Amino acid sequence: MIVYNQALTEKVEYMLDKLSIRGYTLWENVQGRGTSTGVPHLGTHVWPEINKSLLTVVEDDKVDRLLEAVKKIDNINEEVGIRAFVWDVIKTV
C-alpha cells in the first residue's frame, strides 16, 4: 500500500509505469496524519491537504525496487509526504 499527498499523483503514476506495475486499486480523498512529522492531511479549511491511497500486489522481486522508488520520491519531496507499507499476500482468488 502506498499513501501519498495527492500532489504526488503524477510522480506515483510515472513510478508505477517505470516499474511495470499495472494493477492497483486507488482510494481518493484519504484523510490522515503521519506518526511523527508533517501536517495533517484532512481536506479541511485548517488542514486543506488530502491524500490518495493505492493498493497493489507485486511479485517479490519488485518489492525492493518499489520501496526504493517511493523513498526517492519522499527524499525529493519530504514536506509533501509519501509512505509505503508491505504485507505478505498468502493467497488470492
Regions inferred by a protein language model and the residue ranges of each:
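Positively charged, small/polar-rich N-terminal and surface patches that mediate targeting and assembly
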Residues: 1-93
